[in-house]
Amino acid sequence: MNDSQQHRPAFAEVFPRAPELDALVESFARVPELHDPIWGRVKGTRAFRVFASEMTSWLSQKNVSVEDVGHAIMERRGFEEVVLHFDGQNGKVELPVAIVADRGSDGRIEELRIYFSSWPLDGRRVRRPPLLQPDPDLRESDVVGEYQRALAAGDVGAVVAAFEADGYTREPAGAGRVHRGHDSLRSFYELLFSNGGIPLEHCAAVDDGRSCALEYNLVRWGKAELPPAAGMSVYMRGQGGKLAAARIYGDADASARPV
């Protein structure tokens, strides 16, 4: 993989400028393929060109600015987080977006997966069918694994203990749904676990030691079995070895969320 391929922002791959589109189409290992929460599966050169054209037009019409949040690039998979700020009917809107890029051994793109909640767009949460199969061998290490076990068990104390003193969880809706510090986190997770724990099917991860992006399927909330729904979260490790941040993407909890 050359340096330009390794460090190319995933956002630019999903929403290219017109002069870059031909080169981007050629950068896929086979035909372009991506999964978008609204468009669904987009596969093939023609479909990808239509998608890219529509998205570029939307970015322009909505006066969108892009705030970089974070990224991690590994040999075969990487992710990027951004926040889109754009003009809404009642003022500025922000939409957190995460993008995962799978690449072949030659650095060419195999698949792109996009995660965001539809709530900031239209006030609705829409369950998204699974994009990936669960990987039974996938195990998260250190504090990320501790958090996942506490989440599955519905253990409020253990979840809160996994965070740094000033750590936070950001819900998919964005900055208006941030729970920072142990007291705020405790209140949030007490409500979240009111019906029990939230075990996830772990499907794929990107972990560079500082951040861990986990793609998963939500299949159960407490005692309630749910239709499998795709989601993604990014966990940032702090200097103290605990979580500095947990940022959630998508509407996997659309059918079960108590808040």
Regions found by a protein language model. Give the residues of each.
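Short, low-complexity N-terminal intrinsically disordered segments enriched in polar/charged residues
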Residues: M1-E26, W119-A161, R257-V259
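A beta-strand edge to alpha-helix "cap/lid" segment located at domain peripheries
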Residues: S53-S141, R186-V259
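A solvent-exposed, acidic/Ser-Thr-rich amphipathic alpha-helical stretch
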Residues: Q5-H7, L21-R77, G157-A158, A162-R210
